Amino acid sequence: FIAVGTMAQTVEKNDSVKNAKKTKEYQFTDVKLLKTTPVKNQSSSGTCWSFAGTAFLESELLRQGKPEVDLSEMFIVRHAYIEKAEKYVRMHGTINFGGGGSTLDVLDIIKKYGIVPEEAYKGLNYGLDIHRHGELDAVLEAYVKAVITNKNRKLTPSWKEGYIAILDAYLGKEPETFTYQGKEYTPKTFFDSLGLNLDDYVSITSFTHHPFDQPFAVEVPDNWAWGLSYNMPLEDFSRIMKNSIDKGYTIFWASDVSERGFLYDEGYAIVPDDKVKDMSDSEKARWTKLSEEEKQKESKEKSKKEKLITQEVRQEAFDNYETTDDHGMQIVGTAVDQNGNKYYKVKNSWGTDNEYDGYFYASEPFVLYKTISYVVNKNAIPKDIQKRLNLK
């Protein structure tokens, strides 16, 4: 079953005939699919984290048997921009500033300010019907950089008002009240009406430079708010993900997608095991002369054995900047390829113009290798791990 971008998946299916779809090298069969809302398009904005976060919470509502709701990504983005500016100014410009964010930003913002449906706040106040934040990001960055130069030798109380005025001009003013399906709400009362307990969600990661079974702030630029993730051994890190999907909970996933094995248009992400040392002398000579584009093309021409991912391999990639915090997405199911290799099915926020209508398949090695962190419902975590983490 391959969901199209115009309708929610309202049932789980496991039909190997209906679910099979071919690419040049790979044939995927969905094993388990969870309920999702339609694929959206972040367009030219660095707001994947908000799109993935709202998709995750929308699926949580569907899992609970509640009606489909389209939550506003830009309401969250607006408040994150404000909080990010405050932190940037207080830190004298020594933290990251831009459109990016982390998984935990979505939960933190909604806890503080509530949420609104998409129809109440689209964030498109600049003459376009798609999100295009190049100018907005540049203007906001120039503004906060001007503030921290402190030309008056004392910051005025007006800088924040001016900053918010920019957001009002580009995204629109925040609604104090709005009407949705015949009822009037504020952002906080609308959130209350959804019945979500945001304390149910925790972030998980796996790195060796901090103690296991303890929370720490993952050191990536977009974790500007210093959100905490529980650090798990790789085996448990993987077990939580598998258990989550098996128990019917989707996953809010932050990953590196800069790998050449990430082939979104073709609909899959893998970690080819292209070790030069495993090649013959003639193969080594030929391979080392190939450009990166030629290597990528050759990798696509045949199904390749994937790299064995260990805790050490994962850590090394993070330590040397081969793994970076690129993208937020939603893991919505599991699948296998024609050789029985296991994959996670992923909902993206780049529209529906790829092989699988906005979805793709990420191999287990890719997920273990390239995941920065992920958010899950704590009830999806195996009981023994819940006990170790003292989750209640």
Per-region residue spans from a language model:
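Alpha-helix boundary/interfacial micro-motifs
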Residues: 2-4, 63, 69, 130-131, ...
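Generic detector of short, well-ordered, non-transmembrane alpha-helical segments enriched
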Residues: 4-5, 44, 106, 327
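Blade/loop signatures of beta-propeller domains
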Residues: 13-25
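Active-site signature of cysteine proteases
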Residues: 161-392
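Active-site nucleophile-adjacent alpha helix/oxyanion-hole segment immediately C-terminal to the catalytic cysteine
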Residues: 23-252, 354-356
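Bacterial Sec-dependent N-terminal signal peptides
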Residues: 1-12
